[in-house]
């Protein structure tokens, strides 16, 4: 039975449904994206080469459309199933059909379907089988004024007519108990009541945590031992990491976790009387709503039974179900936010500035067994390896001579040192050796994150079957400096460790997002067809792992590719794959100059006609010759404004790399460990991870420091990613060092403001400026500051809760 009718919704289309969730996406582009995707086009291809059809939608919008269509289809499929099931039962009214057909929210759909779901043998089902539904209907109707009891008629008297030994109803009390079970089910399955309860929890509910049975001392969850926060606040992506922290504490049994209304103040005791126990106002409000729904005639003799049913329906059925839904909603928002943070950080790392195709010497640091040294040539090919010892004076001297000789003879242009254990020590030795030998070769610290995973992987074994793990690691470190993207695609992005709570989120959703990011980065940069590994080629639009291996195998047998067109000779490389992939592949050795640009072969004909009209070779349109292309109104009309602009950009700088120019970076040479740090010390650093609560910065002491969000700038910062990104070079000031916890608090604020946290300002005011990076100047304090006091905002508050980095 339905207490009231929900308003019938207007017919909803996919476009209007998606536009409500993503108002920034223009409706006309949605159909084009879905049509192209249905034809087998990839997201990078649609974003790069079909801008005229989509209105230049970016990859984020295109993925939102494709993912949204999948969600829409699942909702429509569920609608169809529910309608069919209820119709099969002969209970589908026109009103119910309209409500189901007009509902595009899965929880609400399930609310409407709940009364008609096939049920297990519940107490209500047993009561119906015992013939007690008429008694339940009489109680309900009397309680709502639909029926007036006969003079002297009572619930007990009415119930006595239903006594039956055969049906196991021994007395009136048993009959009434069965009727109440039916009413409990009726109330708990009512869509309107469930919707109202859900809304109250989402709008006014609080997530609450208290100290759990297995709480440790000290505990990283101490801030949550007596904590509550509005569900509405935690549903905002920028705050959702706090819910993940609460959930992790609950899973580790250091916290209890529940939902409810705001905790009221403890009533004051008066004249020796014990204060009343505070009640949950949200629970009281919901109970009043359920009791009113169960009985509108308080003078009816059966009113207490109906109110009892209301209490039980609310507390035993509806609240647990709704709390699960709210937790699920909070988890989904938190998962999406954490995955987005991780994906953005991975993107920044993958697009780090490359040192370029130059010979590099890689150093995998080690104390006991020595540093493994590997040399790679300008193409990244492994040349040879050796060991450098750091511990003994004799070992250092001999290793130093050997190192200097390697650099001279190998034409080494840079030394890449892993930033793991003994990394700073190795860096110092290498610098001293090169300086003493008069060699002006940059020494660069390179992140080892994920290098050990690669070294032990099947990929590394296939690539270097006869080499030791540590030598593989040194090779990877050298190659990471040459081309971070080409080397990092060999590593599972999850092992790079640049997220927040990534081990707590859905593995499937995380992997899907990271795969999309890697694909996006590879296609954004482009791939040299003649040097790329099969792992890199696999991420090119339309290719995939199998075809990537076929390309490398063909290249090994036939030699380098001389044209994009020759790709069609590779087995299984179809015309459709060519369409999707060709524009992202570069061939420096090609006879056709456009084969080393991002211009798609489908546009060659237009440019060749233009060159013919101008009386110049096609190469004459590149570089300075692009001015004649810019002047061609006919070509602009033929290609469309978006494609024309992209073609001009490619012709201006053929084979351009969208990544920033590499600039060497050095740590302070007088600090190597936490013990070397002093309060107020200013240090250069590299941002290694950005989370919702701040940024982690490597200052060269084997332990990243935290710049809390309140210490990122003199201005209010809502999102740390507005200020910094992984790989950015920054200048930071040491605020606090906790040797016992191996924690460092840092600040990027000016000296006068570094010790005071400022509150939020009106939205849009004092927005921080642009981003830093390898190719840009450092950000943060540049002059020695006054001695700071302990910051008002505890910079370790979030650090203590972070795991899975």
Where are these regions (language model features)?
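Duplex nucleic acid-engaging cores and interfaces of nucleic-acid transaction enzymes
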Residues: 45, 61-64, 71, 75-362, ...
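C-terminal accessory/binding modules appended to enzymatic or scaffolding proteins
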Residues: 19, 24, 353-357, 365, ...
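Long, charged amphipathic helices and adjacent flexible linkers at domain junctions
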Residues: 325-333, 338-343, 495-526, 631-679
């Amino acid at each position: 039975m339905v207490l009231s009718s929900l308003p019938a919704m207007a017919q909803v289309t996919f476009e209007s449904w998606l536009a409500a969730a993503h108002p920034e996406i223009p409706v006309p582009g949605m159909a084009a994206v879905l049509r192209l995707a249905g034809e087998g086009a990839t997201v990078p291809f649609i974003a790069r080469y079909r801008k005229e059809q989509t209105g230049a939608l970016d990859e984020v919008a295109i993925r939102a459309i494709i993912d949204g269509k999948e969600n829409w289809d699942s909702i429509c499929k569920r609608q169809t199933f529910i309608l069919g099931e209820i119709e099969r039962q002969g209970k589908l009214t026109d009103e119910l059909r309209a409500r189901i057909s007009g509902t595009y929210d899965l929880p609400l759909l399930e609310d409407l379907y709940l009364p008609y779901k096939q049920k297990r043998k519940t107490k209500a089902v047993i009561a119906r089988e015992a013939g007690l539904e008429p008694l339940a209907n009489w109680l309900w109707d009397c309680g709502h004024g639909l029926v007036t009891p006969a003079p002297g008629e009572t619930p007990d008297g009415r119930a006595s007519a239903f006594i039956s030994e055969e049906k196991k109803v021994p007395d009136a009390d048993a009959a009434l108990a069965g009727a109440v079970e039916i009413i409990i089910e009726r109330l708990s399955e009512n869509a309107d009541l469930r919707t109202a309860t859900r809304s109250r929890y989402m709008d006014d509910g609080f997530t609450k945590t208290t100290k759990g049975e297995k709480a440790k001392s000290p505990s990283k969850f101490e801030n949550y031992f007596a904590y509550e926060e509005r569900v509405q606040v935690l549903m905002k992506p920028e705050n959702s990491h706090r819910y993940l922290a609460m959930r992790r504490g609950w899973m580790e049994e250091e916290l209890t976790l529940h939902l409810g209304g705001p905790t009221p103040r403890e009533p004051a005791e008066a004249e020796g009387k014990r204060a009343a126990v505070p009640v949950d106002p949200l629970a009281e409000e919901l109970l009043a709503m359920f009791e009113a729904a169960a009985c509108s005639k308080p003078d009816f003799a059966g009113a207490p039974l109906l109110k009892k049913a209301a209490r039980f329906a609310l507390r035993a059925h509806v609240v647990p179900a709704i709390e699960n839904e709210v937790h699920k909603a909070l988890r989904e928002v938190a998962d999406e936010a954490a995955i987005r943070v991780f994906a953005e950080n991975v993107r920044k790392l993958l697009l780090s500035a490359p040192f370029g195709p130059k010979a590099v010497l890689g150093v995998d640091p080690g104390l006991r067994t020595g540093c493994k040294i590997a040399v790679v040539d300008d193409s990244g090919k492994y040349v040879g390896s050796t060991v450098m010892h750091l511990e003994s004076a004799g070992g250092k001297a001999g290793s130093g001579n050997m190192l200097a000789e390697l650099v001279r003879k190998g034409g080494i242009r840079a030394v890449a040192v892993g930033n793991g254990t003994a990394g700073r020590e190795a860096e110092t030795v290498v610098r001293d050796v090169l300086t003493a030998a008069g060699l002006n070769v940059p020494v660069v610290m390179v992140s080892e994150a994920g290098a050990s995973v690669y070294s032990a992987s099947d990929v590394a074994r296939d690539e270097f079957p006869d080499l030791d793990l540590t030598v593989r690691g040194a090779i990877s470190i050298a190659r990471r400096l040459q081309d971070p993207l080409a080397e990092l695609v060999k590593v599972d992005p999850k092992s790079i460790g640049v997220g927040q709570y990534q081990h707590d989120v859905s593995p499937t959703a995380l992997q899907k997002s990271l795969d999309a990011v890697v694909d996006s980065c590879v296609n954004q940069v482009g791939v040299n067809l003649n040097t790329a590994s099969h792992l890199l080629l696999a991420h090119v639009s339309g290719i995939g792992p199998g075809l990537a291996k076929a390309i490398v195998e063909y290249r090994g047998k036939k030699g380098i590719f001389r044209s994009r067109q020759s790709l069609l000779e590779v087995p299984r490389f179809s015309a459709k794959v060519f369409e999707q992939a060709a524009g992202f592949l570069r061939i420096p050795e090609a006879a056709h100059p456009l084969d080393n640009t991002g211009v798609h072969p489908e546009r060659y004909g237009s440019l060749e006609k233009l060159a013919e009209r101008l009386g110049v070779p096609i190469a004459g349109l590149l570089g300075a010759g692009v001015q004649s292309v810019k002047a061609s109104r006919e070509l602009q009309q033929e290609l469309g404004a978006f494609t024309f602009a992209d073609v001009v950009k490619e012709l201006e700088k053929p084979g351009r790399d969208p990544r920033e120019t590499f600039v060497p970076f050095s740590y302070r040479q007088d600090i190597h460990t936490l013990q070397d740090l002093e309060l107020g010390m200013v240090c250069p650093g590299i941002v290694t991870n950005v989370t919702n609560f701040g940024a982690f910065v490597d200052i060269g002491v084997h332990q990243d420091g935290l710049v809390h969000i309140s210490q990122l700038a003199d201005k209010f910062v809502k999102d740390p990613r507005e200020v910094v990104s992984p790989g950015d070079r920054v200048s930071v000031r040491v605020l606090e060092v906790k040797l016992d916890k191996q924690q460092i608090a840092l600040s990027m604020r000016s000296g006068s403001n570094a010790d005071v946290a400022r509150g939020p300002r009106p939205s849009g005011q004092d927005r921080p400026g642009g981003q830093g990076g390898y190719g840009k100047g450092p950000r943060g304090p540049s002059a020695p500051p006054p001695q700071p006091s302990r910051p008002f905002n505890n910079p370790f508050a979030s650090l203590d809760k972070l795991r899975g980095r």
